[in-house]
Curated annotation (Swiss-Prot):
GO terms for molecular function: 4-hydroxy-tetrahydrodipicolinate reductase; NAD binding; NADP binding; oxidoreductase activity, acting on CH or CH2 groups, NAD or NADP as acceptor. GO terms for biological process: diaminopimelate biosynthetic process; lysine biosynthetic process via diaminopimelate. GO terms for cellular component: cytosol. NADP(+) binds at R38. Pathway: Amino-acid biosynthesis; L-lysine biosynthesis via DAP pathway; (S)-tetrahydrodipicolinate from L-aspartate: step 4/4. The active site is at H156, K160. It holds the Pfam family DapB_N. It comes from the Bacteria. Transmembrane segments: none annotated. It catalyses: (S)-2,3,4,5-tetrahydrodipicolinate + NAD(+) + H2O = (2S,4S)-4-hydroxy-2,3,4,5-tetrahydrodipicolinate + NADH + H(+); (S)-2,3,4,5-tetrahydrodipicolinate + NADP(+) + H2O = (2S,4S)-4-hydroxy-2,3,4,5-tetrahydrodipicolinate + NADPH + H(+). It comes from Desulfitobacterium hafniense (strain Y51). It is found in: Cytoplasm. This is 4-hydroxy-tetrahydrodipicolinate reductase.
């Protein structure tokens, strides 16, 4: 059986380490390389408190790293400042990037799409790899047909750099597809402290919480006459994301276009 050759960018981070561990457990995948600016020179096995694997962690990702390892897929869990550069490196090397790092804006995505069109190499971007989170968004979209008054609270660990989360923005996008334009709240509402009502996207308020002890959580709260409905998803550990990431790696290896969202791989 031909194995999918996977390179992990950001392998020294919490998500990166979990991805590496999970790839090592897959019969149809082979870890061929890893990069992390803070762990350069270390064996990836040593980083995971395992026996050496003979894979030395490189510094910031370069095209040469991907070509030398003959990777099929580059999984990226770095930071918003590095993810676009890493995606460009992957596409230039003929490697399909699977991007889990959030923080890409519309201009970044447009640039990636143009490069995909030029190189004919596929790419995959997911705001969230948790299958439960995808279902939460689907359920919220269905509920919005009947409960148009809605707000979102997303809660993450205090080291997350971007706000609101990509999942919250994607949830608004899905809800807006079925929700008629609506001005919520009192027309004369005002904030005593700027930002008290959160960010407003398409008339839906998003509130971002950043605290230690949290991983990734989201509530979509609907209000109606005499009733309220809350749809919530909790990621209780980073293992939450592994089934979705492995699914994405398997599916992305067959791509020749840009695909955004894990929902595209769910039957």
């Amino acid at each position: 059986m031909k194995k999918i050759r996977v390179f992990v960018s950001g392998a020294g981070g919490k998500m990166g380490r979990e991805v590496v561990r999970t790839i090592l457990d897959q019969e149809d995948m082979q870890l061929v390389g890893a990069s992390d600016a803070r762990q350069q020179g270390r064996d990836i096995g040593e980083l995971l408190a395992m026996a050496p694997l003979g894979i030395e962690i490189t510094g910031p990702l370069e095209v040469a790293h991907l070509k030398e390892t003959r990777a099929d897929i580059m999984v990226d869990f770095t930071n918003p400042q590095s993810v676009l550069k890493n995606a460009k490196c992957a596409l230039a090397a003929g490697v399909v990037p699977v991007l889990g790092t959030t923080g890409l804006d519309e201009a970044d995505i447009s640039e990636i799409r143009d490069l995909v069109d030029q190189t004919k190499v596929g790419a995959f971007i997911a705001p969230n790899f948790a299958i439960g989170a995808i279902l939460m968004m689907r359920f919220a979209q269905e509920a919005a047909k009947y409960f148009p008054h809605v707000e979102i609270i997303e809660l993450h660990h205090d080291q997350k750099l971007d706000a609101p989360s990509g999942t919250a923005l994607k949830t608004v996008e899905w809800i807006s597809e079925v929700r008629k334009p609506l001005v919520q709240g009192h027309p004369n509402e005002y904030e005593k402290i700027k930002g008290s009502r959160g960010g407003d996207v398409d008339g839906i308020h998003i509130h971002s919480v950043r605290l230690p002890g949290f991983i990734a959580h989201q509530e979509v709260i609907f209000g109606g006459l005499g009733q309220a409905l809350t749809i919530r998803h909790d990621a209780l550990s980073r293992e939450t994301y592994m089934p979705g990431i492995m699914l994405a790696v398997r599916k992305a290896s067959q791509l020749s276009n840009l695909v955004i969202g894990l929902e595209n791989f769910l039957e």
